[in-house]
Amino acid sequence: MTNPITDEFGRSFKTLRVSLTNTCNLACSYCVDASEIKQTKNLHQKTLTTKQYLEIIQVLHKVLDLETVRLTGGEPTLYKELIPLINGIKNTGIEEIKMTSNATQLDAFNLKNAGLASINISLDAIDADVSFDISKRNKLQQTLSGIDKAMEANLQVKINTVVMKGVNDNQLMKLFEFAKERNISIRFLELMQMGFLYHNFQQHFFSEEEIVKTISANYEITPLDRDASATAKYWTTNDGYKFGIISNESDPFCNDCNRLRLDSYGNIYGCLSDNYPISILDCLDDEQTIIERLVKALAQKKTKFSGSE
């Protein structure tokens, strides 16, 4: 299939990130402002139905020949029709279905049977007190149990850790060893200059350089070539363990990003950090209009991440 939607840098959309809901059962400090924490406990957001999501995904797949769908949130496991949705996506013929989750209520075996191939699990601390300070919830053990369940279900598992100076940078090597012992690839994420952190993220910013310095003080490490469109750069230890760093600020991957975002209202965004929604719910039976709006979304892509309020 010839993709009619390509920009001057050769970028196109091959991965669809679907934000199933804005709600979450955690209130992590890099995601939720302290003034909003109490609101997250009883917040229930209306989302698209499974039928609507599948109709949109089928239309986008027809135009873009998508390779991957990644289900995100908020927390995607809060979406009540998650398993039927995954089953429906599998039936569209899209090659890979992935998910990013905190794994606190993970139905791993049924998700695997429905068609989920891999899961990135957010884990920002091993020590319970640090985990609570970040997430404002006592759910560390549920996440650790979720990691075990995902591995038992033979899902491909990765761990995502947002590293924050003065908050959980003292957890970095503990998390590294936890992942290494289980042969799970861990990716350390730089804090992003987004949302309420736009004007003051430097206070807790812990750079790729600092992450590499911390790990290389304990292991001999070698950088690997970055795959095209990959979010992370990877290194290996001298005994063959592979880990990654997502350098959202130091070295963003915008120049060959192939991701399209779909939110829970039926809007698309060409840049994951963009604040300007483009609705496609009103034109799902009009392929030419879909293409025009996808071209508009592609024009939102930056050549370098610059933050977003």
For the regions a language model picked out, list residue spans one by one.
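Pocket-edge positions in alpha/beta enzyme catalytic cores
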Residues: 8, 45-48, 74, 135, ...
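Glycine-centered loop/turn positions within well-structured domains
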Residues: 26, 128-129, 252, 278
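Conserved, mostly hydrophobic/aromatic
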Residues: 20, 71, 266
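Canonical Radical SAM [4Fe-4S] cluster-binding loop centered on the CxxxCxxC motif
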Residues: 8-50, 64
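Accessory C-terminal segments flanking Radical SAM cores
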Residues: 195-308
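A detector for short, charged/polar N-terminal pre-domain segments
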Residues: 2-8
